[in-house]
Amino acid sequence: MRGDEVGGPIRWRMHIPVPPEELFAILNSDEGRASFWAESAIEVDSHIEFRFINGYTYRGKVLARRPPNLLSIDYLGGSVRFELHADGRGGTDLLLTHEGVTAQEWNEVHAGWLNVLFPLKAWAAHRVDLRNHDPERAWDEGYADQ
């Protein structure tokens, strides 16, 4: 987002044309997260096991959950907040904030969130999965549609 600096918090805003309750349900469910974020993202006892197409796994922890406005998780060594605000017209203004990203990884993580947010919007608004689901065409190989 404009004003973000390498090593500081990563922030992205996105408008998604569904109500906060619907968007929160996607972010907060195993099936929802698997529809746009990871091949699977199963929550057990407030821990989410993310499994990605390239074989990478990450075990995050839910830090805060206040339906339908806030979901915060430990993710990739930092904390990620999804703040959802009704736009007054049936949609949601989402603010994603990722804190704790090292300066060394900042540019890749900053860009990588777009690879999560655009598929989230496509799934929420149109039930379309933008990902290719091909392990030979993953983020590590330069593909944005992993």
Predicted regions and their residues:
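Residue-level preference for beta-strand/loop junctions
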Residues: 6-8, 54, 76, 90
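Short, intrinsically disordered, mixed-charge
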Residues: 25-32, 67, 111-126
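Hydrophobic ligand-binding cavity/cleft-lining segments
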Residues: 1-40, 146
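Short, highly charged C-terminal tails/helix-capping segments
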Residues: 122-146
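Glycine-rich portal/gate segments that line the openings of hydrophobic small-molecule binding cavities
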Residues: 28-79
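Generic structural detector for well-ordered beta-strands
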Residues: 13-17, 49-51, 61, 83-85
